[in-house]
Amino acid sequence: MKFRCPGALAVGTGFIKDYELLFKGSKTGSYLTIEEKKGSSVPVAIWKVDENHERALDRYEGYPSFYYKKEIEIDFISLKRKLPHRAKAFVYIMHEDRCLGIPSKGYLQVCLEGYKTFGFSCKYLEDALKNSMEVKHGNNNK
């Protein structure tokens, strides 16, 4: 984010409930997305962005052809004061017709670094990768 959106501010962390983390994509690569799944959750960083940041993110994420945006209400803990908050936010979600896939080592490393920066368990990424590997080897029907 600091490279794509200079001036954007990380304000908190939280969880998107009833969604799971997945690696999906196309022939050019597999990337993170979320899909609905009751009982699951996905850790997220909450960023304060302006309209210019949002336009830059739209271009970077391939909106609206690769990802679409969804507005959600999310509970989160502020980074500065560690207080609970609730806010409207937007998330990028890859179109559901994309297939599960295995990300590049470089992309996975960037994701791991982001998770570590915000203190998230890497188990979410490991589970998403395991799910993709099972599909590649025919052990899953997603």
Role assignments for model-derived ranges:
Residues 1-142:
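Glycine-aromatic micro-motifs
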